[in-house]
Amino acid sequence: MSTANDKRTVLDPFGTTVIEDYDKLYVEFGIQPFKPLLNQVPNPSMYMRRNVIFGHRDFEPVLNAMKNHEEFAVMSGIKPTGEFHLGTLMTAREVIYFQKQGAKAFYCIADVEAYEDNKIPFEKSEKYAAGNIADLLALGFDPKEGYIYQQSKEQRVKDLAIIFGRAATLATMKAVYGERHIGLYLAALIQAGDILMPQLKDFDGPKPTVVPVGVDQDPHLRFTRDLAARFRRKYDFVLPSSTVHKIMKGLDGSPKMSKRNQMSYFTLHEKPETIAKKISNAFTGGKPTVREQRESGGIPEICPVYELDMYQFEEDDKEIIKVYSDCKAGKLLCGEHKQRAIENVVNFVKEHQQRRKKYVDKAKELLQVE
């Protein structure tokens, strides 16, 4: 668990992350701003253009590989604890973006972490995993240009974790992750193995590798980069890079969507009418009355409905700018905006659910499960 001098800044990949000012992360945690690199990125993603990806760690080697059409990898995954939600959607889209830019894509089913962090039995996580991979394929992941695997069944990852354990003291693990049971420290070492496996000779490594993460997962990257430096002589590792994205607010206005509050989030498998109800009841940056909003405008910066557009469901950058300016000017009322958002989200979810049905068998085949 990483904390800064400001008690309101906490990055905890296994717990609660608290961020009041993203700009402070540049100084306090050494995350580098992404914006200065934006004009150099061939075909930047929606998240890059909109500053949703606000930071990075050592992205330049990946950027150079993209510009020079050289080999590089993208690595991410999912903890199989349930259905695809907006956080996993964001990361999956980032993986698919880099895959389309030429990366070899590695996607991990983090079943060891699911067991250690969430007490999900391996048999149960296997069932979740098949559904998660069907979602990934429906979103556009190309399995011919990727490698999908389960942590518990990938011996190379486990071997790396054992080797990395020689360089990880209990004091280091406590400093990075806080006081945890040993199993979570093991899961962190395995995740380091996930991140660095694409650089093994079995996969034509070493090579630049980018890991798209939410800011709450940044401690994993710092830990893994330290291990990569320590084992560079043995494996010739290139220090792994990352892109760092912001965390979406809960629909209820909370700092983060949480399964503890069903009204704060939705999955890609919920009924459209349920999703519509949740958006209709969402917190907004609007004023108490129509008159006040017309006169002084809304506050899109704190509005989860605006974030649905900004992060996920409005592809047109010009429309995003218009929604923002109309809200600030009092031209767009919250009720009208919610109806637009409901239409965009429900249309996307309906189409996704239909596409996903076509990939269930393929997902089971890739994972070798029934």
Descriptions of predicted regions:
Residues R156-I162, F223, D252-P255:
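Short, solvent-exposed polar/charged micro-motifs at secondary-structure junctions
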Residues S2-A73, P80-L200, Q354:
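N-terminal Rossmann-like or analogous alpha/beta NTP/dinucleotide-binding catalytic cores
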Residues I78-P80, S152-E154, V215-Q217, D252, ...:
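Short, flexible loop/turn elements at secondary-structure junctions
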